[in-house]
Amino acid sequence: MDNRTAIIKQPDNISFFNDVYKLQKEYQDALILDNSNPDFIWIGEHQLCYTLGRGSNYDNLLFSLNDAKYDVFKIDRGGEVTCHMPGQLVTYLVLDLKNFNKDLNWYLRKIEEIIIKILGAFNINCHSREGFTGVWIGNKKIASIGIGCKRWITINGFSINIDCELENFNKIVPCGIENCLMANMIDYNKNLNIQEVKRIVKKIIQEEFNFDFISQ
C-alpha cells in the first residue's frame, strides 16, 4: 500500500468535545468532496462530557438531562453512551476507507488490534471480547470504540482510559453494558504517562495505515 498523507493534531490542552467534533466533520466533508485531500488524525483529551450514538437509548443515562451539570452530545457514530474526561486519551480518525478496505467490520477489528498493540507496548495484556466492541483486561473494559461513516469516510474513533476518574462512568450504563467495570492503564503500569501513550498511539497508527504525517 502506498503511503497516504494525513494531518495530525495533538493538542496539549484539554479540548472541548464539540469543537473537535465540528473539526472532524469539516475534514470528513472535505474528503467527500475531493478524496485527494488528506486524512485527519486527532489525539488528545476532553473536558468531562457524555456522548451518545445515533441509536442510543437515553435510559442508559443514569441522570436527568434537565439537571445535568455536564455536556451531553448525540453524535454520528454507532454504539451507546460513553464518557470522556481528562486522563482519558481520545483518538479520532477521519479516513477514506476506499484507500484501505471498504468494510466497517474490518475497520472495527483493525481499531481493536491497534489498541491491543498500544497497550502491549506498555506490557499490558488485553483482548477483544466476542460479541462486544472495544478492548478489555479480564472482565474490565479499558478502551471504547465508536465510529461514524459517510460515503466510506470515517469519523470518531476510540478512547483509552489512562489515569482518569472512573467514577464518572457510574453516571451511565457504559456502552449499554449492564454492570460494566472500567479500568485505567495506570493500574497495570505505574510508570507510564499520557504523553508517552500519545507518542505510541501516533507511532502505531502511522505504521498500521502507512501514513506520512503533517503536524498542525
Curated annotation (Swiss-Prot):
Pfam families attached to this UniProt entry: LplA-B_cat (PF21948)
EC number(s) per entry: 2.3.1.181
Residues at the active site: 175
Keyword Transferase assigned: yes
Site location (Lowers pKa of active site Cys): 141
Predominant location category: cytoplasm
Keywords recorded for this protein, A-Z: Acyltransferase, Cytoplasm, Transferase
Compartment(s): Cytoplasm
InterPro entries reported in the protein's UniProt record: aa-tRNA-synth_II/BPL/LPL, BPL_LPL_catalytic, Octanoyltransferase, Octanoyltransferase_CS
Enzyme class, first EC level, given as a word: transferase
Domain BPL/LPL catalytic: 35-213
Membrane-spanning ranges: none
Source species, domain of life: Bacteria
Record's catalysed reaction(s): octanoyl-[ACP] + L-lysyl-[protein] = N(6)-octanoyl-L-lysyl-[protein] + holo-[ACP] + H(+)
A biological process from GO: protein modification process
Binding site for substrate: 77-84, 144-146, 157-159
Annotated Gene Ontology cellular component terms: cytoplasm
Protein purpose: Catalyzes the transfer of endogenously produced octanoic acid from octanoyl-acyl-carrier-protein onto the lipoyl domains of lipoate-dependent enzymes. Lipoyl-ACP can also act as a substrate although octanoyl-ACP is likely to be the physiological substrate.
Comment field (misc): In the reaction, the free carboxyl group of octanoic acid is attached via an amide linkage to the epsilon-amino group of a specific lysine residue of lipoyl domains of lipoate-dependent enzymes.
Family, per entry: Belongs to the LipB family.
Name this polypeptide is given: Octanoyltransferase
Gene for this chain: lipB
